[in-house]
Amino acid sequence: MLQQQESPIPRLGVGEEGVVGRHVFGEVWGVNDKLLQDDEYLKNLVIKAAEVANMHLVDVKVWRFGGGDKGGVSVIALVLESHIAIHTWPAYNYATIDVYTCGEHSRPWDAYDYIIKQLNPKTFTKTIVDRSSK
């Protein structure tokens, strides 16, 4: 039978015993649609968020999806520690944000908070999950 365990957040001090995984993700509503369509702005936002969170950037890719007023942008930053992703739906003033890191030295919540501050949504969610192996 599958057992659910309570998990302290953030979980520190596990480095030598196993994988330290920290996952921060959520959604934003009420963001300026022009920001959510601006792939260069979003790319630079993710780069700066990685820096703020003490992550080591490997590469950033940007994709535009759809067309017209319903087209969105996806930005994925590969960082040595894992990834940062933003997916936008400008027609709905909506986006999702995902920051996942492995290791004890990075601070994914700082990256998430930086992105939120820069996007300035009317409302947002923030979920922090400990994804450590022990």
UniProtKB/Swiss-Prot annotation:
Gene Ontology CC: one annotated term: cytosol
GO molecular function per UniProt: adenosylmethionine decarboxylase activity; arginine decarboxylase activity
Pathway: Amine and polyamine biosynthesis; agmatine biosynthesis; agmatine from L-arginine: step 1/1
Enzyme Commission number(s) of this protein: 4.1.1.19
UniProt KW Coiled coil keyword: no
Cofactor: pyruvate
Pfam entry (one): AdoMet_dc
Keyword Lyase: yes
Chain ranges passing through the membrane: none
Catalytic activity field: L-arginine + H(+) = agmatine + CO2
Modified residues (Pyruvic acid (Ser)): S82
Residues at the catalytic site: S82, H87, C102
Similarity comment: Belongs to the prokaryotic AdoMetDC family. Type 1 subfamily.
UniProt-listed NCBIfam families: SAM_DCase_Bsu
Protein name: Arginine decarboxylase proenzyme
Lineage, uppermost ranks: Archaea, Thermoproteota, Thermoprotei, Thermoproteales, Thermoproteaceae
